[in-house]
Amino acid sequence: MYTIGQVSAMFGLPVSTLRYYDKEGFFPNLERKGNIRYFSDNELEALRIIECLKKSGLEIKDIKQFFVWVSEGSSSYEKRKELFEARKSAVETKIQELQKTLSLLKFKCWYYETAMKDGNEDSINAMLPDKLPENIQKLYDKGHE
């Protein structure tokens, strides 16, 4: 069993967030002794799922719906799987977008490092758009997809 302060430290979440989740009903079996909340491994796993879904872009109301489905048992397996498939797809799309952004950022770092070394952009511009060094060309191409 863990106190709210311990869980806050474990997950890097403010205590206020944990209280909010509790108030929203995410921890229906949370043990209380006096005014102190005690989190079991079940609550920790629920918190991992909440944070995973939240980081995937799902809103709290939709995360609550997931937990309603969990309470329905095996009859909601398909809905839960579809939710996770959709979130996985959304995260994969976001990763692709970020990879494109990262490629362009890396290209521009090389671009300005080279321009500073040369004192101008002439040699770089002469190589654009398709005569760059191979590794830099890949970054340029990915960033300009």
Specify the residue positions occupied by each region the protein language model found.
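Residue-level recognition of short, well-ordered coil/turn positions
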Residues: 26, 58, 74-75, 120
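A generic structural signal for secondary-structure junctions
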Residues: 52-55, 68-71, 110, 114-117
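Basic helix-turn-helix/winged-helix DNA-binding cores
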Residues: 1-68
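Residues at alpha-helix boundaries and short interhelical turns
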Residues: 54-57, 74, 95, 99
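Helix-centric, low-specificity signal for extended rod-like, repetitive segments
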Residues: 12, 41, 47, 73, ...
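Short, charged recognition helix plus adjacent turn
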Residues: 64-86
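A broad detector of the eukaryotic-type serine/threonine protein kinase catalytic domain
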Residues: 49, 68-71, 89-92, 96
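C-terminal regulatory/oligomerization modules of transcriptional regulators
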Residues: 78-145
